[in-house]
Every structure is written in structure tokens, then in C-alpha cells.
Amino acid sequence: GGIIAGFGARIGMGCNLASFFTGIPQFSVHAWFFTLATLVGVWVAAQVVSLPLFRSKVKLVAATEQKPITQNPARAKIFFVLGVLVLVGISVWIVWLMAFKPTPEGKNISPLAIAMLCGVGFGFIISRAQICFTSAFRDLFVTGRGMMARAVIVGMMVSTIGVFSYIMLGMPPKIMWAGPNTIIGGFLFGFGIVLAGGCECGWMYRAVEGQVHYWIVGIGNVIGASLLALTWDYYAEPLATSFPRINL
């Protein structure tokens, strides 16, 4: 699942972020193609994972006594201190980049500093809120729940207003090719994230939280993206670069 999703995301010019959550607010047609194809891929994968092949056999064992949950305060304190040190280190780095690092020509502030600041904020928010784009898509077909999907849509509405204001100030939006690559990539991405149980965002913060399953998904994702990079030159023109970049 990770390999399929990684390959699909890159051939589609972005994952659930670049070709959906931030792609649609930037008015790029390719993001709409990718999103619709992703929904189809999610639906197909939801049918596939319901097959007996993917159903784990559960063996129920009678419990004779309760085992209390033990906590290790010292271990928790160590990880808290490490987290604080990492946060302080990143903050110092950002301040240094903004205050002392020479900025590229035509830039008023370091792009790396802005990227790091936004990355830290985004990672903290999706981790604490447990935002999962996979469940937002998958649950529509599997359980009928739409809470996460509604939350994502509201976020995109707010993002659209913000992006539009920047466009009015003269900042160009990120518009990608609206070609077959987005449809192929969207389908593969949607299928892969359901099979893997996590999307590009979800596996990252869950892997850091210690969920070993998502370490494997992440490795597969890197493999899939690498396969795309190695083979991109063979089909870039017929599938992507020969098609127009359509700005809505």
C-alpha cells in the first residue's frame, strides 16, 4: 500500500496535500482530477480490503485475571525533555535563519525559515488533532461517517480565502499539468492509502508516535516515490508535461 500510494502521489503531482487540500484552494484543475480519481481508488480499495484475504483471523482467549497497566514516569520525563530540546533547537534555527542568514535575491525572508515554521506548526496540529485524510475518504464508503470529511472541507474553505488574498497581492498559485497522470496518480494514491491504512500525512506523525506499522508504510512510500523518480523521464511528456496547466 505504501509503495502504491507513494508512486501515485508523485505521478499525480502531489498527495492529499498538494493535489487536494492545498491544490484545490489554489484553483488548479489538476487537483480536481486527482481528487475525483482518489475517491474512485478509495472506493475500489474499500471493496478489496473487505475480501476474506485481508480479514485477519482473531482467536479469542478467555481472560483469568486483569493485568494492570504500568506506567514509567522516568521514561515519560525523558521523552518530554527530548521533545522540548528538539523544539528549542528548531526555534533557535528558525530565528538564526531569519535574523542572520543572507536571504536569496528577491526574497525578504529566508524561505527555509518559513518552511520550517509552517512545518512545525502543521505537524503539531495534525498530530494533536489526529487528522487523517485516509479515514476522511475511506469512512464515507466503509462506515458512512463524514465528520472528518466535513472538517477537511471546512479547512479547505478557509484555505481558499487565504490563498485568494495572496493571489490578489501578486503571488502566483501553484498550477500543475492537468493530464492523465493526475487521474492515474489519484486512483493509485486512493487505492494505496486504504490498503496501507494511512496517507502521506498520517504515516509520518504516527510513525514518530511509535506505531511500527507506519514505519513500514513510510519505507514503502519512499520506495514508490523513488520508482517514480527513476522512471519519470519515460512517460513524463505523454502523460503530464505535454498537457496544459489550467488555472481556474
Residue ranges of model-derived segments:
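Membrane-interfacial helix-loop segments of redox and metal-homeostasis proteins
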Residues: G1-L248
